Amino acid sequence: MTQEERRRWLICYLQREMPEYAHYGIPNDEAGQWHLLRALFNVRPPAPVTQKFQRIEGELLKTITAAKGIVNGMALPASGLDSRLALWQDDITRLRIDAIVNAANSQMLGCFLPNHNCIDNIEQTMAGVEMRYDCYKLMQAQGHDEPTGKAKITSGYHLPARFVLHTVGPIVQGSLTDEHRRLLASCYESCLTLAAEHGLKGVAFCCISTGVFRFPKDEAAHIAVRTVRHWLDAHPDASIERVVFDVFEDADLLRYERLLYT
């Protein structure tokens, strides 16, 4: 199948599954088709899919990621401050590494807003709809929302990363408190602990809580670097060899450069 054939097949499958969206015609252009397909991915409730769907979805998503360029996270230049750390600016879904981190919400089901550009939406989109169903099963077994500062692990599905570590960061409403700081540090600690329990060697962190959760970005970066270094120092026999801080905005790149290279 061509990429267009895959997009059309997946759209038709999802529109049959969710007839309330069947009135949306399939655009003729690539961008329009992807916009509609991604929206359908995003609004789809957690549920299993057929093996054929998984195969076609995987072929589509892996081809998209390959065209962006897959980057070996373990081979990124080490920080001048700490050889265990690295900094990278770009789309975290391009990284081939044992695990990338997803800044999730407490329901752990991903972002349902069509084509929203939060990290949760992007990672779940490029992983495939199987990830939402996996998270759903984890949450059903748990029986309650995910606490702030904890973490869960799922397969990376169609991502270059083998696994995704999902963590819920603190929401800052009003003034920043010591409890916010403690919970943010706990996100990093929980992810590293979970990664080590699974014998993972590389972890790439997105910026946690600095978007709609409104954690001040300068302090969040300091907490991230300090917490990761302290955890690695306290666990010298852990499997983790490389931690990557992934940023997207130029301002975040400068923040982390000051912390990691000066």
Model-derived features with residue positions:
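Macrodomain-like recognition of ADP-ribose-binding/processing modules
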Residues: 1-262
